[in-house]
């Protein structure tokens, strides 16, 4: 039986996973993303290389005890290794809180943050898990920061598309 999932456990799990660090193929290093890629059977380490921030979030959610399939019915576009799928999932399941990025009062540790136009000029291009909220800044555990996991400080600005809060004890049904 899995432990009861909480936002607090998700923030702690994400912090630990970010500091591991996980990484794709780097000069002189083979990828260690196998635990992150494994749940997605049609995805290889080479295909995931440089494209795994959403899979990192999924890995952290599962490790924290959240029971979520790789492709919930709410996900129309792709499975949860894609950022857009997390938005579809949150907006399609009324138990999950979805708040637009301009709602700066909402985010707290353990929330998922979706970004627009962080690495490329596209919506839904990156995501992570909030570990700490400061006044106008978020401390976020992210996968795929230059193909590595890590902790990063991000301003609460127009790049934030939305915040997602999975309720404590959530199980997909």
What does each model-found stretch correspond to?
Residues 1-71:
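N-terminal capping segments
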Residues 4, 8, 67-148:
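...with weaker cross-activation on analogous glycine-rich loops/strands in unrelated enzymes
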Residues 12-15, 82, 86, 159, ...:
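Intrinsic disorder/low-complexity segments
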Residues 15, 25, 58-59, 98, ...:
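Sequence-level detector for tyrosine residue identity
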Residues 30, 45, 61-64, 94, ...:
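Short linear sequence elements within intrinsically disordered, low-complexity coil regions
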Residues 37-40, 90-93, 149, 156:
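Solvent-exposed, flexible loop/coil residues
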Residues 133-173:
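Active-site signature of cysteine proteases
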């Amino acid at each position: 039986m899995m432990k009861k999932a909480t936002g607090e456990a998700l923030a702690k799990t994400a912090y630990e996973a970010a500091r591991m660090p996980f990484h794709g193929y780097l000069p002189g290093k083979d990828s260690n993303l196998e635990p992150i890629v494994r749940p997605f059977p049609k995805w290889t380490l080479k295909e995931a290389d440089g494209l795994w921030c959403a899979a990192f979030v999924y890995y952290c959610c599962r490790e924290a005890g959240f029971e979520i399939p790789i492709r919930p019915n709410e996900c129309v576009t792709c499975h949860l290794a894609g950022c857009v799928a997390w938005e579809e999932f949150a907006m399609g399941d009324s138990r999950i809180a979805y708040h637009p990025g301009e709602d700066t009062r909402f985010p707290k540790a353990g929330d998922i943050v979706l970004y627009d136009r962080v690495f490329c000029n596209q919506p839904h291009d990156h995501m992570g898990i909030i570990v700490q909220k400061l006044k106008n800044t978020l401390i976020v555990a992210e996968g795929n920061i230059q193909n590595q996991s890590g902790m990063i400080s991000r301003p609460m600005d127009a790049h934030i598309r939305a915040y997602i809060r999975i309720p404590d004890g959530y199980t997909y049904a």
